[in-house]
């Protein structure tokens, strides 16, 4: 088909007959065929079509079918750069705004993007149309747009791309534009909910490293890791820019929407009070997604319409996103809005609430939320938090959660921060609390790397006994306590050496030797069964694993116990 003649000729016929459907069908055929042509011919086609519809005589055609052409041109966006983007922008600005709005929302929801640029182009088109729509019920349009935005965003995040920064940027500015386009309370509330959804999606993909950056600001025993891991935060600058933009919108809404703080904290309190937690795989619920798929252009309704109709296309808060907003806001603004929320809604069960919350976040695949979980511990100032007896069990569960996170991650910076918060928190507790946690971990924890870490901590505590006047600390090396620990060693069945068990066994031998040189061991207390198992296994693995360190400590212990 010779489209150079067909396009203007068919346009003339369409004007005369007002048969815009036939003209639209012709353009669809031409654009579909051109998708297999070379890039130069595609570019020439898009430019030709753009120039044709820009002519004043074709204004009516443009207004009538722009919404349809956008869908036809979208596959060229990201391929025929500039020309396709400019054409979509022209169609959005000159087509019927309501029809353009509907079509672009539909395309966002359907997904199937080949590049992030298609997502960005559609969002720009929607906002262009939204600014030309006059309505008495703006919240209907805003809610439909936000549902479409997050459906499209969830789809585009499945694509591996270096352009995600631009995707986040346009998503943030889209919420901001919608907020300023219709500055009324109903739209403000919708945008407040949108902030929570965006925060949830953002942290499901990105990591702000708030916990590690907080650790770097301290001067403690973990400072030695600064030089080794100093490059870990090099990518945080761009993410900080995005995060601060989200928080700026959040703050604006908090200041302009009456009772907004109460609305968001009450929602979070209700969700946290529930016994179960449903993890969402996307930013909107299945009900909202179904609404989005079937959404029509919001028609003007008379004043007798019920409020129930308004809720048909309403987005909802994302609880994880709400909590993340308060946490991130606390980091950038040197406040503690997260702790303010806990004190306001859970004054007597702060630790229990944090333990429950962290247990949820730890189970998520997202490193971003794991980082948030650890930073929330810093916000609570766990190392100096006065733990009542009624919450000691929750403290233990919380620390076990952080320990589990440290053992299961391959990220050095996250492992460092998790272990740091556990150690610093234990140091601030009474010796009885510390000892209880140590024994519980050694007896019950199935993960050898966690048992290795806690045994190392126990060894350091034992070394403090001699120079300490603290009565409770002496229980760390009492005969009964050591007997319990050695029973754990002896109960270790089927000792087979591998990378993890090697570290644990090495730590047990170092621990025994440290007790021996402090004259805290006797023949009656020595874990003979365990020691014999280890000695036998080392001989079996001769040459297969680096066992020289184990042999060294076994020889030392043998010589001192003869």
From Swiss-Prot:
GO terms for cellular component: cytoplasm; cytosol; nucleus. GO terms for biological process: regulation of proteasomal ubiquitin-dependent protein catabolic process. InterPro entries: Glomulin/ALF4, YAP-bd/ALF4/Glomulin. Keywords: Cytoplasm, Nucleus, Phosphoprotein. It is found in: Cytoplasm; Nucleus. Belongs to the UPF0649 family. This is UPF0649 protein C1442.02. The lineage of its organism: Eukaryota, Fungi, Dikarya, Ascomycota, Taphrinomycotina.
């Amino acid at each position: 088909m010779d489209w150079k003649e067909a396009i203007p000729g068919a346009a003339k016929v369409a004007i005369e007959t007002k048969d815009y459907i036939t003209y639209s069908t012709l353009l669809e055929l031409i654009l579909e065929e051109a998708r297999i042509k070379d890039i130069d011919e595609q570019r020439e086609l898009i430019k030709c079509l753009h120039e044709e519809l820009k002519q004043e005589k074709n204004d009516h055609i443009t207004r009538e079918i722009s919404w349809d052409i956008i869908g036809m041109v979208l596959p060229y966006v990201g391929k025929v750069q500039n020309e396709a983007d400019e054409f979509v922008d022209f169609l959005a600005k000159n087509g019927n705004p309501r029809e353009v709005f509907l079509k672009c929302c539909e395309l966002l929801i359907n997904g199937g993007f080949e590049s992030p640029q298609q997502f960005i182009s559609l969002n720009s088109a929607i906002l262009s149309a939204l600014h030309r729509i006059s309505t008495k019920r703006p919240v209907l349009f805003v809610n439909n747009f936000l549902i479409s935005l997050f459906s499209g965003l969830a789809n585009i995040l499945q694509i591996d791309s270096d352009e995600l920064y631009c995707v986040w940027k346009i998503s943030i500015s889209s919420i901001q534009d919608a907020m300023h386009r219709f500055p009324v309370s109903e739209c403000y509330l919708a945008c407040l909910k949108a902030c929570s959804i965006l925060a949830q999606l953002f942290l499901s993909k990105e990591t702000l490293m708030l916990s590690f950056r907080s650790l770097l600001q301290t001067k403690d025993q973990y400072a030695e890791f600064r030089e080794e891991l100093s490059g870990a935060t090099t990518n945080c600058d761009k993410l900080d820019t995005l995060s601060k933009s989200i928080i700026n919108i959040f703050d604006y809404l908090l200041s302009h929407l009456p009772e907004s703080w109460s609305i968001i904290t009450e929602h979070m309190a209700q969700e946290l009070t529930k016994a179960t937690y449903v993890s969402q795989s996307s930013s909107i619920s299945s009900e909202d997604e179904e609404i989005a798929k079937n959404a029509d252009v919001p028609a003007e309704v008379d004043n007798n319409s019920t409020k129930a109709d308004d809720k048909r296309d309403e987005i909802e808060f994302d609880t994880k996103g709400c909590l993340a907003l308060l946490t991130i806001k606390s980091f950038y603004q040197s406040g503690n809005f997260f702790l303010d929320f806990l004190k306001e809604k859970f004054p007597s069960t702060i630790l229990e609430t944090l333990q429950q919350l962290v247990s949820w976040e730890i189970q998520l695949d997202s490193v971003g939320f794991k980082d948030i979980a650890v930073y929330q511990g810093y916000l609570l100032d766990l190392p100096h938090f006065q733990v009542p007896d009624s919450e000691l069990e929750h403290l233990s569960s919380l620390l076990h959660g952080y320990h589990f996170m440290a053992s299961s991650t391959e990220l050095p910076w996250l492992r460092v921060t998790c272990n740091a918060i556990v150690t610093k928190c234990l140091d601030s507790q009474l010796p009885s609390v510390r000892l209880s946690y140590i024994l519980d971990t050694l007896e019950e924890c199935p993960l050898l790397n966690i048992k290795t870490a806690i045994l190392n901590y126990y060894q350091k505590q034992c070394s403090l006994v001699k120079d300490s006047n603290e009565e409770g600390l002496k229980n760390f090396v009492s005969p009964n306590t050591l007997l319990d620990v050695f029973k754990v060693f002896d109960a270790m069945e089927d000792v087979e050496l591998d990378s993890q068990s090697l570290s644990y066994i090495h730590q047990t031998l170092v621990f025994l030797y440290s007790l021996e040189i402090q004259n805290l061991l006797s023949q009656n207390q020595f874990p003979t069964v365990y020691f014999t198992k280890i000695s036998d296994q080392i001989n079996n693995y001769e040459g297969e694993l680096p066992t020289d360190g184990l042999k060294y400590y076994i020889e030392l212990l043998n010589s001192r116990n003869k």
